[in-house]
Amino acid sequence: MSQSKKIFTRMCLNNWGGINHKVLQFNEYVNLFSGKSGSGKSTVMDAIQVILYGSFSPTFLNKAADDAKNRRSVLSYLRGEQKDGSANRGDCDFCSVIALEIEDTGSHTFTCIGIAFEVRKNDSEIKRFVYFSHSGRMPEPSYVTADGFCYSNNDIKKFVNTRSQSADRHARSEE
């Protein structure tokens, strides 16, 4: 009989780095991140760190991926800032969600944890964010409204509240 463990099954990146909307599938045993320089390996790893540790400190992010003129920060990831100085979301207000789906291999239950952000085009720091967790798998489509927009902080709170009314009542959001 194998021992129960918690494994990442999926990851959702909405408006993070150069990614508009992506759901990554993880293998239970081995996951290899490979690609050319600038392809997004560190972008994914930094998102995992931000979710798990909740730190927005630039010193916490992957320093090895920085070069002298491009210092990574959570705000620069949210804006989708590129090495050439452009930004995918630099001149608009937008929302972002990064989340991990975790399976308990013993009970085959799922829990999702993540952070939702709201960023205004003139923000110089992160002001509006919500840490959240809920039971069950990620919603479909992953934290995106029927209109195709990333969930806002209020959308996340409503979703988490709905999940907290479910049979297992395991959900939470905090600002």
Predicted regions and their residues:
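Extreme N-terminal "head/tail" segments of very large remodeling/mechanoenzyme assemblies
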Residues: 1-150, 154-157, 162-165
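Conserved small/polar residues in nucleotide/adenosyl-binding loops
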Residues: 174-175
